[in-house]
């Protein structure tokens, strides 16, 4: 049994695993200007940007800096949004009572010192659902933080996957 454990240790010892981030130290500062918004929904750009910044802080690899002092700049644009009715309330005719909200962002990651594009126009999509309870605007506003959180996690994952 001891020889099996030693053999297993020898084999697994050959596997490479890094603790921490593989992002080079000189590239661990990032700026995230407010996302552009072509989604057709006002205010979602600021909310998504705020959640992306929070997610970078939570994840911990990058320090948030202003554009002039960061090594990387993440540019984002909300390029598409869709509302799809999922269920209807029979008491109010054919009015939808639940919707799926989809939001697509396009991100570009630039190494500021060289201008090199590390990510170029990568599209990332997030979805959430919401109930209208008779008020579409309130339902949408309630959905904004959920979709922003999901989208921000996918955006940060895409940036980290570059390394």
Where do the protein language model's features map onto the residues?
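Surface-exposed short loop/turn segments
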Residues: 18, 59-63, 69, 73-118, ...
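Second-shell loop/turn segments in exported
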Residues: 36-41, 134-144
């Amino acid at each position: 049994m001891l020889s099996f454990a030693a053999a297993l240790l020898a084999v697994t010892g050959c596997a490479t695993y890094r603790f921490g981030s593989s992002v080079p130290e000189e590239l661990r500062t990032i700026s995230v200007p407010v996302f552009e918004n072509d989604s057709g929904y006002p205010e979602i750009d600021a909310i998504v940007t705020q959640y992306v910044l929070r997610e970078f802080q939570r994840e911990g690899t990058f320090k948030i800096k202003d554009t002039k002092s960061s090594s990387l700049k993440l540019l984002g644009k909300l390029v598409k949004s869709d509302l799809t009715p999922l269920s209807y309330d029979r008491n109010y005719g054919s009015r939808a009572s639940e919707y799926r909200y989809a939001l697509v962002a396009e991100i570009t990651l630039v190494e500021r010192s060289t201008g090199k594009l590390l990510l170029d126009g990568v599209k990332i999509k997030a979805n959430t659902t919401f109930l209208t309870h008779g008020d579409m605007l309130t339902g949408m506003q309630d959905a904004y933080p959920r979709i922003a959180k999901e989208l921000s996690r996918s955006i940060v994952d895409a940036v980290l996957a570059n390394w």
